[in-house]
């Protein structure tokens, strides 16, 4: 049975460290 593939999440830019 073909399982739905999870959508690839684009890598998020690192949040700025304050």
UniProtKB/Swiss-Prot annotation:
Q: What induces it?
A: By bacterial infection.
Q: What is its main location?
A: secreted
Instruction: Indicate whether Signal appears among the record's keywords.
Output: no
Q: Where in the cell is it found?
A: Secreted
Disulfide bridges in this chain: none
GO BP, one annotated term: defense response to Gram-negative bacterium
Instruction: List UniProt keywords, sorted A-Z.
Output: Antibiotic, Antimicrobial, Immunity, Innate immunity, Secreted
Q: Does the keyword Secreted apply?
A: yes
Q: Which GO terms describe its cellular component?
A: extracellular space
Q: What does this protein do?
A: Antimicrobial peptide active against many Gram-negative enterobacterial and plant-associated bacterial species. Not active against other bacterial species like H.pylori, P.mirabilis, B.pertussis or N.gonorrhoeae.
Q: Which family does it belong to?
A: Belongs to the apidaecin family.
- What this protein is called in its record is Apidaecin +S
